[in-house]
Amino acid sequence: MASTSRLENNKVCCYAHPESPLIEDYRAGDMICSECGLVVGDAFGGPENPLLSGGHLSTIIGPGTGSASFDAFGAPKYPNRRTMRSSDRSLISAFKEISSMADRINLPKTIVDRANTLFKQVHDGKNLKGRSNDAKASACLYIACRQEGVPRTFKEICAVSKISKKEIGRCFKLTLKALETSVDLITTADFMCRFCANLDLPNMVQRAATHIAKKAVEMDIVPGRSPISVAAAAIYMASQASEHKRSQKEIGDIAGVADVTIRQSYKLMYPHAAKLFPEDFKFTTPIDQLPQM
């Protein structure tokens, strides 16, 4: 079976024609030898991947353009064929989907690697039968973010996925159960910095919102409310007290929660507003003039 090779500088090349330039097939994500048409690597990590069977890609032959691609009669030496296992093709497709989603929300390679490993475990265990690979890939990326300490909301994953928020949530629960794994509980602090940055709010509003959310949880004012909705309500309260006001809709669009969800948490927090703000906060709008729900 044909295989790939590497030059001394660790550059991927064709084993039979190491000096021939490689052509990148952007659509398929493959690197193809321009002389014989051998696919020697791909976009998600080169010819070797420990998550694939045997630790490497099987031989993949594409249509070459050089003289080495044809025999003496002008017929292609290597007809278009792929000998890769179907299970590996499924994994490669999922890995590329995970990588694509991660790129769109600027997630680091460590999270991509963890998500790939989680997907491989689900795939090999034949878990989540009846669920699409895209749904499983989205759930694995969500779990990887949580496990790596940089959680994202279901809406953020949904925005770069082909899968609904509801289906990602279902696959998330099923994956945790199937792999007998867990994730740390999310807190309001996990999202506050990113939400405020996306809302273009200054540091003083972010610090106030962080303090408000933390105090609300400590005082047990918002029992049963999700950390995301509490964070959103705290941002709303802090912004309304400042000159950098943001509407419930603006905050909801960033946080991925409905206006009514923000109102419900805010309504619980409002009677205690005087105890929630940090002592050094400079009010533009006094507490007694904050919106009442």
Swiss-Prot record:
Highest taxon in the source lineage: Eukaryota
Keywords assigned: Metal-binding, Nucleus, Repeat, Transcription, Transcription regulation, Zinc, Zinc-finger
Matching SUPFAM superfamilies: Cyclin-like (SSF47954), Zinc beta-ribbon (SSF57783)
Any one Gene Ontology cellular component term annotated for this protein: transcription preinitiation complex
Chain intervals annotated as zinc finger (TFIIB-type): 10-41
InterPro entries, per the entry: Cyclin-like_dom (IPR013763), Cyclin-like_sf (IPR036915), TFIIB (IPR000812), TFIIB_CS (IPR023486), TFIIB_cyclin (IPR013150), Znf_TFIIB (IPR013137)
Compartmental location: Nucleus
Any Pfam family the entry gives: TFIIB
Principal place of residence: nucleus
GO terms, biological process: transcription initiation at RNA polymerase II promoter; transcription preinitiation complex assembly
Gene Ontology molecular function, alphabetical: RNA polymerase II general transcription initiation factor activity; TBP-class protein binding; zinc ion binding
Sequence repeat residues: 101-177, 195-271
Keyword Repeat: yes
Residue numbers binding Zn(2+): 14, 17, 33, 36
PANTHER family: TRANSCRIPTION INITIATION FACTOR IIB, TRANSCRIPTION INITIATION FACTOR IIB-RELATED
Record function comment: General factor that plays a major role in the activation of eukaryotic genes transcribed by RNA polymerase II.
Family: Belongs to the TFIIB family.
Subunit structure: Associates with TFIID-IIA (DA complex) to form TFIID-IIA-IIB (DAB-complex) which is then recognized by polymerase II.
Name the UniProt record assigns to this protein: Transcription initiation factor IIB
Organism: Drosophila virilis (Fruit fly)
Source taxonomy: Eukaryota, Metazoa, Ecdysozoa, Arthropoda, Hexapoda
